[in-house]
Amino acid sequence: MIRTATLTIFHLFLSFFVAISTTLADIIEISDLAPLAELLKESDKDTLVIFDVDHVLIMPTDEHTLNRHPYRKQLWQEIESRLSKEDMKTLYGVATSKAKWRLIDPGIADIFGHLRAHKIPSVALTSIYTGKFGNIERLEDWRIKHLHDLGFDFCNLTPVKGEMLLHELEEQDGTPMLKSGVILTAQVDKAKTLACVLSRSNYYPKTIIFIDDILSNLESLERLSSELKIKFHGLHYTATSGIPMPVINEKIEKIRFQILEKEHEWLDYQELAARVPALTE
């Protein structure tokens, strides 16, 4: 009888533990913003909402994206096989400095309106490099400007004000930092960088909502949240997979990449037509 009772109690405890674990953390795949909007209805000042940037908030327009079309990706990889990492940074800086950007989903404006109206703490978390990058003097300022231009200002939403340089995490791709409510990891693991920001500021929310297009980033933050006993909602955002692939002209693209490699210029189609009139004939 005692053994039976003990086993029953153990099973009850195990069930309770599993239930608690399930409620503390979950990751779901979403293709639109409706699940995020629903989560925000239950959020308050004790929630931290974290947004990835590329392919979640913004992305380059079709003419300027470098990796969404297989042929462009192939041309880029061919150049990469010939050049050093530093030379590639230079070319990437040239190309990205001319890029035009678009929203992934215009409905994000309503999400940010809700965050501002209800004063829900929010930050951006991006793995982008920092510091000088090719002809871009400070990549962090370049990134923040694009966000501001498209309506994403985290300065009044971030719970951690000011600028924070994380020199202890510094590697070859720049210094991880917090600036204007944007955490830039310089290719350091997102969870590791976020943990440093939270520790330095002694700020620990009760709940984290994180939206990212890369599953491993979500899993990394899920583990961190578990360690910190923070409830976690991960949203694996796949909206870009439903956006039609850019329509390109392979002949034009090949010349475009040749000019990029040899002359360090990234031309749009109109500029290419002016440079090489025969392309439009």
Labelled PLM ranges:
Residues D26-A34, E38-E170, L184:
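Alpha-helical substrate-recognition element adjacent to the catalytic core
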Residues L33, Y129, F133-E281:
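C-terminal cap/substrate-recognition subdomain and adjoining C-terminal extension
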Residues M1-A5:
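Positively charged n-region of N-terminal signal peptides that target proteins for export
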Residues S21-A25:
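Boundary at the C-terminal end of the N-terminal hydrophobic targeting segment
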Residues T8-A19:
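Bacterial N-terminal signal peptides
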Residues F16, E42-D44, Y203:
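Residue-level detector of transmembrane insertion/anchoring sites
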